[in-house]
Swiss-Prot record:
Descriptive protein name: Cellulose synthase catalytic subunit [UDP-forming]
Sorted UniProt keywords: c-di-GMP, Cell inner membrane, Cell membrane, Cellulose biosynthesis, Glycosyltransferase, Membrane, Transferase, Transmembrane, Transmembrane helix
Positions of region (Catalytic subdomain A): 271-364
Compartment(s) where it occurs, according to its Swiss-Prot or TrEMBL record: Cell inner membrane
Family: Belongs to the glycosyltransferase 2 family.
Enzyme nomenclature, EC number: 2.4.1.12
UniProt organism field: Salmonella typhi
Domain PilZ: residue ranges: 694-790
Catalytic center residues: 313, 457
């Protein structure tokens, strides 16, 4: 390149060109791409007056106008990308110019839209004001209870008849389309309304469409003339029926979350009951358990009414000495039958408190835990159990491996944020094994914690409900713990939960037996059905292959009718769940969670259905490290198998599209769309199986907390603590950071009116951002530090509010990116025999996507882009 340029060009130009070539190479361009980039540059300078100010402005805005083209690393077909993007920008600019004279009509339309949203936002309050007089008049008050029940029965009967007609009435394609348009219009009309009315309306619309779909599937879509099609169709129908049942039960469960608030305790502390705090442990590290004990010691409760117990099923001397040192009780069993349940039951023989609070050994309670929960027990004498959320301050494998910690609600947020709150409405709150308080008298009546299944917590709450006792749930986080560190540990935990819930279904089925209300039976049933999702999910991931590979008609109907029934069913369910679950589970993420678990929970749940006594308890490991980024090939093997199977389906689909019967073309396209969606979801599952590095043993917790640091010379600086861990803190000094790395300073933190001092060393200074490492602390200082940080009453309460509202289309785009990321990981980590397939596939997709035009960046480019493009057109 250098010799050729020197021969053809004058020295200054040759030197500049050689410089450009070397710059391209330094940024990773191949020799051919770098040489071609230089050639395109020469041609551009010959054809276009790039030195003109107008072109200079375009070049200055390159990053904004052409965000997908790296000018420092050219590719052979970059001219085509520039051409496509330029045409796109010109089109945007021209369209805007054409419509500029009509800006007033658009402004009017925007004003109408704003008025509509304002009207919808204020509708519930206006309806309430206009119907207040009806509540006061009590127009039906003169009627007897029997008459009112009769009127209600008539209304319900007519509603059911109308619903039955809507569900079963057959329509031709045009009528079905019009019917769906009407329902969709109503859904769009009410979905922005605040309050519960809009959610109830969306549930009604979704149930109408979904019930109509299931009716159509059972009555019109099975091919009874072809055995293969019939068998495959029935298998898919089984999975769809399961999904429909879970959908209906799920709507019922969360239709009216209770959102229970704390009840104040009596002012006279002598009326407060005695409480035992149990911290069971088996093989966890002492450092994991210490913070829980330190926080328990600081709980705001009379010390003569509080007893803390370490229940050590590992029988370790270090734990015994630690308990003696900090002044808590210690119990170790000689035998270890029934795992955690047996450990707690053994401790119940020694503890004599009126209530027992149970924490897993990594769950750190806040100081307000008992004051927030115990008031309800004094108010309601039949209340047997109060559950609070399981909140985690470390990322679970999904959050860590996908980089979504505190960006997307995690897997457990839906259960603890919405489902348990919905259960509370129906008096069906489950005991979750930790972060809960149980009244001793009812617990003793049922013989202690249930030991017949491996999910002793849910089984215990079921027994309490059968005895006529009530339960409660408070959604305010009052403790926080460690999430599982690896995907394999996470899956192992879910396998235990799934096996245990199915064991309860078989051994103590909530649908039968005495003591439960109908609503409680349905809530328990839905919880157990949730863990049977493995087989249906695998069916959905392979169903389109029945047609593409076996030519079996799993839905025996024209492709147009399939679209008119399937798409509305999915869209309405997605829209309704987005409205109800928006803060707790973003759209399409359930697909990822279920796909990751499906293969692994299917066999144990099937075994538990057949033989409920088979299986054993496994302890979930906490507090581990992941020292290197790697793919868990053992865990990801099933996903890769399903990916290859679906790729085979794509190949078969392409063949059928070109060489199959013409009347099947639309069916082939629908099947391929389904397969591509499955491939995206499976790609997401693969992305989760790539374990990211976790080298911090002490997890950082983000917070905004006032504090101060004191230098040895007496100077004091106010600061804000923005993160902390068990080993150090990150602070921002309010003003100039007048500290040096290696300098020893004292950190001052407040708890209530009390101020505490902790010795630290400066390990990092970046502007006014300072990293502090805790120096060795005394036991008293360590207790104080935990109570000033992890155990603060307000530490966890605002975490849930930090999640953005769900936007289904944005969530779908996130899932698409996630799926592509999974295949990139396969191309990076796969064995040579497989790597070439996925590397070629991801490279092809990335190459195709690189030609798609992008919108210019908003802040930097959209405003000037119109002017620049106009200049370019001149």
């Amino acid at each position: 390149m250098s010799a050729l340029s020197r021969w053809l060009l004058i020295p200054p130009v040759s030197a500049r060109l050689s410089e450009r070539y070397q710059g391209y190479r330094r940024h990773g361009a191949s020799p051919f791409s770098a040489a071609l980039g230089c050639l395109w540059t020469i041609l551009a300078w010959i054809v276009f007056p790039l030195e003109h100010p107008r072109w200079q402005r375009i070049r200055d805005g390159h990053k904004a106008l052409y965000p997908h083209i790296n000018a420092a690393r050219p590719r052979p077909l970059d001219p085509a990308r520039y051409l496509i993007q330029t045409l796109w920008l010109v089109m945007i600019s021209s369209t805007k110019e054409r419509h500029e004279p009509r800006w007033r009509s658009f402004a009017r339309l925007k004003d109408v839209r704003g008025r509509y949203h304002q009207w919808m936002d204020t509708l519930p309050e206006r309806v309430r004001q206009k119907t207040t007089h009806l509540e006061k008049e009590k127009e039906l008050g003169h009627l007897s209870n029997g008459a009112r029940r009769f009127i209600l029965g008539v209304i319900v009967t007519f509603s059911l008849i109308l619903a039955l007609i809507c569900i079963t009435q057959p329509f031709n394609p045009l009528s079905q389309f019009i019917f769906l348009l009407l329902l969709w219009g109503v859904a769009l009309l009410v979905r922005r309304m605040p309050g519960r009315f809009s959610a109830l309306m969306l549930i009604v619309l979704s149930l109408t469409v979904s019930c109509r779909y299931i009716w159509w599937r059972y009555t019109s879509t099975l091919n009874w003339d072809d055995p293969v099609s019939l068998v495959c169709g029935l298998i898919l129908l089984f999975a769809e029926t399961y999904a429909w049942i879970v959908l209906v039960l799920g709507y019922f469960q969360v239709v009216w979350p209770l959102n229970r608030q704390p009840v104040p305790l009596p002012k006279e502390m002598s009326q407060w009951p005695t409480v035992d705090i149990f911290v069971p442990t088996y093989n966890e590290d002492l450092n994991v358990v210490k913070n829980t004990i330190y926080a328990s010691l600081g709980i705001d409760w009379p010390k003569d009414k509080l007893n803390i117990w370490i229940l050590d099923d590992g029988g370790r001397e270090s734990f015994r000495q630690f308990a003696r040192h900090v002044g808590v009780h210690y119990i170790a069993r000689a035998t270890h039958e029934h795992a955690k349940a047996g450990n707690i039951n053994n401790a119940l023989k020694h503890a004599k408190g009126e209530f027992v609070a149970i924490f897993d050994c990594d769950h750190v309670p806040t100081r307000s835990f008992l004051q927030m929960t115990m008031g309800w027990f004094l108010k309601e004498k039949q209340l047997a159990m109060m559950q609070t959320p399981h909140h985690f301050f470390s990322p679970d494998p999904f959050e860590r491996n996908l980089g979504r910690f505190r960006k997307t609600p995690n897997e457990g947020t839906l259960f603890y944020g919405l489902v348990q709150d919905g259960n509370d409405m129906w008096d069906a709150t489950f005991f979750c094994g930790s972060c809960a308080v149980i009244r001793r008298k009812p617990l003793d009546e049922i013989g202690g914690i249930a030991v017949e299944t491996v999910t002793e917590d849910a089984h215990t709450s079921l027994r309490l409900h059968r005895r006529g006792y009530t339960s409660a749930y408070m959604r305010i986080p009052q403790s926080a713990g460690l999430a599982t560190e690896s995907l394999s540990a996470h899956i192992g935990q879910r396998i235990r939960w799934a096996r245990g819930m199915v064991q309860i279904f078989r051994l103590d089925n909530p649908l039968f037996g005495k003591g439960l209300k109908l609503a409680q039976r349905l809530c328990y049933l839905n919880a157990m059905f949730h863990f049977l999702s493995g087989i249906p999910r695998l069916i959905f991931l392979t169903a389109p292959l029945a047609f593409l590979l076996l030519h079996a008609y799993i839905i025996y109907a024209p492709a147009l009718m399939i679209a008119l029934f399937v798409i509305p069913h999915m869209v309405h369910a997605s829209l309704t769940n987005s409205k109800i679950q928006g803060k707790y589970r973003h759209s399409f993420w359930s697909e990822i969670y279920e796909t990751v678990l499906a293969w692994y929970i299917a066999p144990p749940t099937l075994v538990a259905l057949i033989n409920p006594h088979k299986g054993k308890f496994n302890v979930t490991a906490k507090g581990g490290l992941v020292e290197e980024k790697y793919v868990d090939w053992v865990i990801s093997r099933p996903y890769i198998f399903l990916v290859l199977l679906n790729l085979l389906g794509v190949a078969a689909g392409v063949w059928r599209y070109y060489y199959g019967p013409e009347n099947e073309t639309l069916t082939v396209i629908v099947s391929l769309v389904w397969v591509f969606y499955n491939l995206v979801i499976l790609g997401g599952a693969v992305a989760v199986s790539v374990e990211s590095k976790q080298v911090r043993r002490a997890h950082r917790v983000e917070i905004a907390m006032p504090g101060a640091i004191a230098r040895e010379d007496g100077h004091l600086f106010s600061c804000t603590v923005h993160d902390f861990s068990d080993g150090g803190l990150g602070i921002k000094i309010n003003g100039q950071a007048q500290v040096l790395e290696g300098q020893k300073v004292n950190l001052l933190l407040k708890r209530g009116q009390q101020e505490y001092v902790f010795p630290t060393q400066v390990v990092r200074v970046t502007g006014n951002e300072v990293g502090l490492q805790l120096m060795p602390l005394t036991t008293k200082q360590h207790i104080d530090f935990v109570q000033c940080t992890f155990a603060r009453a307000d530490t966890w309460a605002l975490w849930q509010d930090s999640f953005p509202e769900d936007k289904p289309l944005e969530s779908l785009l996130d899932i698409l990116k996630l799926g592509f990321r999974g295949y990139r990981h396969l191309a990076e980590f796969a064995p040579p025999s497989v790597k070439v397939i996925f590397r070629s596939l991801t490279a092809l997709i990335a190459w195709i996507v690189s030609f798609i035009p992008r919108r210019p960046e908003r802040q930097a480019a959209i405003q000037p882009s119109d002017r620049v493009m106009a200049q370019a057109q001149q």
